[in-house]
Regions:
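Conserved, single-site charged/polar hotspot
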Residues: 1-410
Length: 410
């Protein structure tokens, strides 16, 4: 990839920004089915698609519900014709089928998303493996981003907030393409879930696509390298650094005060979890029958809980890391009351790791907290409020990140 330095975000020598804050392969060609074709034409492919310099990204598509990378079958519509593939399909006898969708894209009807059925542009690779079918969508990075922005931020948000989101998403994607964590095992750069960035869950709108186009190629770098541009929904009043995941925090991620989203429903919340629920989780975790106590034993500099001690009749076990703690304290099926008094049913994770708890053995655990998401990087709700107050997308990024430059990815 190539970059050139545009503007510097932050003030060198003045402590930087008060910050804290979510490659492609060679073109394999495009194949389109015609009315006279029994099957869609297969795009040429080869080892050259493993290049990381083409400006294309390879996305591993998960199944409905985002439970697995493997599909038992795939049904799709290409140029008005319907096709179905299974591991026994003759077209997959060589192990791989590559389809090109053209301008209309490929509609995969066997995958359910929030807005179904999803449409994918570029090429679709169907790989036959012993575990099932792998689906990899290879497409231009900018086209990919048009599927990420509306899936990660409401299209109703202000234009400048959407543009800041587009730059974060682009930077994050380029960073993942360089790291290649899925390349060796799956031949992909990212998947389409919250494991990386949600892609293709909600269809693009003119407004979200415009945000991508108006920031075309812009990424955030430090020392000439793309940063990992994390983002999340709503802060508790302060952002975190990536130290909440262990290790030393990155220099471009600093904890900052964040009052822009202080009136958001998720800025504070409370939930009660029955003691018996946590006792069952403790039993699954440790094998012990009795849960004696739960207490916070460690917090990050920003106030996020990073250590939770669970004491049983046999031992004391400490959970470390915000994700593990939020998972153990999952309010699944419980009622969460938000700041404005509205209620929602809890999911598989505690809304955030910014919380306090009051444990009553044999009764319940009362948890009061603030924020939604991991808290690292840019608060999307705050970004929208900043945009309403007249902040530009560059100024929004300046607030959440430190000592970075805006460079252009090509």
């Amino acid at each position: 990839w190539k970059t050139w330095t545009g503007c510097v975000l932050g003030i060198a020598g003045a402590g930087g920004i008060e910050s804290g804050m979510a490659v492609g392969m060679q073109n394999t060609g495009s194949a389109e089915a015609t009315e006279n074709d029994d099957l869609p034409e297969i795009a040429e492919s080869g080892d050259e698609r493993l290049s990381t310099l083409s400006g294309k990204i390879r996305v591993l598509l998960m199944d409905s519900g985002y439970q697995s990378y493997y599909h038992s079958s795939v049904t799709l519509n290409l140029n008005g014709a319907d096709y179905e593939y299974t591991p026994d399909s003759p077209e997959l006898s060589q192990g791989e089928l590559v389809l090109g969708g053209g301008e209309a894209g490929i509609t995969i009807t066997s995958i359910e998303r929030q807005e179904s059925p999803p449409v994918y542009y570029g090429t679709l690779e169907i790989q036959n493996t012993p575990q099932g079918l792998l689906l990899i969508n290879e497409l231009p990075l900018e086209t990919y981003l048009e599927g990420v922005v509306p899936s990660e931020m409401p299209a109703s948000y202000e234009g400048q907030a959407l543009m800041a989101q587009a730059v974060c998403a682009r930077t994050y994607a380029v960073c993942q393409m360089e790291e290649g964590s899925l390349q060796e095992e799956y031949g992909a750069d990212v998947d389409d879930s919250v494991n990386f960035q949600v892609y293709g869950n909600i269809a693009p709108t003119d407004k979200t696509s415009q945000a991508v186009r108006e920031t075309s190629g812009q990424i955030m770098c430090q020392d000439g390298k793309p940063v990992t541009a994390y983002y999340f929904s709503t802060s508790s009043g302060r952002t975190s650094t990536d130290e909440i995941w262990g290790g030393t925090s990155s220099s471009y991620l600093k904890s900052v005060e964040c009052e822009f989203d202080q009136n958001a429903p998720w800025s504070s919340w409370k939930v009660t979890i029955p003691w018996t629920v946590l006792e069952e989780r403790t039993r699954n975790l440790t094998g012990s029958e009795s849960l004696e106590s739960i207490q916070v034993v460690k917090k990050s500099e920003s106030g996020a809980v990073t250590g939770l001690q669970i004491t049983t009749e046999k031992e004391a076990v400490q959970l470390e890391g915000e994700y593990e703690i939020r998972e153990f304290l999952s309010p699944q099926g419980q009622t969460i009351t938000e700041k404005d008094g509205s209620t929602v049913t809890g999911g598989s994770l505690l809304p955030s790791s910014y919380f306090q708890l009051k444990a009553n053995k044999g009764g319940c655990v009362e948890i009061t907290g603030g924020g939604f998401g991991h808290g690292v990087g840019m608060s999307q709700t705050a970004a929208n409020e900043m945009a309403k107050e007249g902040y530009s997308w560059q100024e929004i990024l300046e607030y959440f990140f430190r000592d970075i430059t805006l460079d252009r990815y090509e």
